């Protein structure tokens, strides 16, 4: 009897999270990660270690003479990773050649341009008619590698971070941290934190834990916050530790560095933050804060005083989002976009005419039935 009363009083809203979980797992997840920093800091090795895959098997390392005049290039690599029935489409954006030239003036401009181009493409797609299948190519996170051999951030590091800190979530990383003693690591971390504050460079901010979070999560969250900038070591090689256990790490004459040992480096904290706990928040900050900031700047540029008279601005304020002019496309892309929209409008018109014909036919059949 009590069970029957319980069933009658149960509506079923408690099952809503299960619906979202099934839908999310079926759809899969997209994540775009940018890696930047000078060559030789272990960026490729760390990425392969983080995701247990080889994204750089076809890479050719240029000779030292070729690096003298090397220019920065943007490379995009994609891989689908499945774990426990959950699929993640990972897109890695690499920046080979960054900081390798003798003259590094404005070498960060291609990176800024690439990030803004992804915002521009998303804004264009979002303002179009076909909004169901928008491909999100925006950069959700940038791992910026800092040399362990300097005394903090170099002028190039500061210039790059200033140029992108309002466009992407920055996570600073000290590469090849096994070159430092523990005391040196902590001193370098504090120096970098002080410089970031002094230069007013905004890096990714961890959201505050809810009061109802369990204590283990709060402890892990505090450890991750204290680890920034993450001092990491990457390796896909399996070696034997002092207890003859197989571990991923690096063997030296003075001992073994274990990649997944929290006493040796911050690799586990970085992977936990990047994948297990804050991946979705990185995407939300990208959309709700960084992209919206770009979108607002685009709209403000259209309504600057002097660009249009007051009447034009009044008219613009009444326009819908789909009517707002977007950044100019190349002519070929514009013609292609127009053809696609014309074809979509034609299909919608045909569907509407078909529905009207069916309604008229049903109405005629109803009138005939009434006459009989």
Curated annotation (Swiss-Prot):
Residues 355-372 have a biased composition (Low complexity). The keyword GTP-binding applies. Residues 352-372 are annotated as: Disordered. Residues 37-44 are annotated as: G1 motif. GO terms for molecular function: GTP binding; GTPase activity; identical protein binding; molecular adaptor activity. It is found in: Cytoplasm; Cytoplasm, Cytoskeleton; Cytoplasm, Cytoskeleton, Microtubule organizing center, Centrosome; Midbody. Transmembrane segments: none annotated. Keywords: Cell cycle, Cell division, Cytoplasm, Cytoskeleton, GTP-binding, Nucleotide-binding, Phosphoprotein. Septins polymerize into heterooligomeric protein complexes that form filaments, and can associate with cellular membranes, actin filaments and microtubules. GTPase activity is required for filament formation. Interacts with AURKB. This is Septin-1. It comes from Homo sapiens. The lineage of its organism: Eukaryota, Metazoa, Chordata, Craniata, Vertebrata.
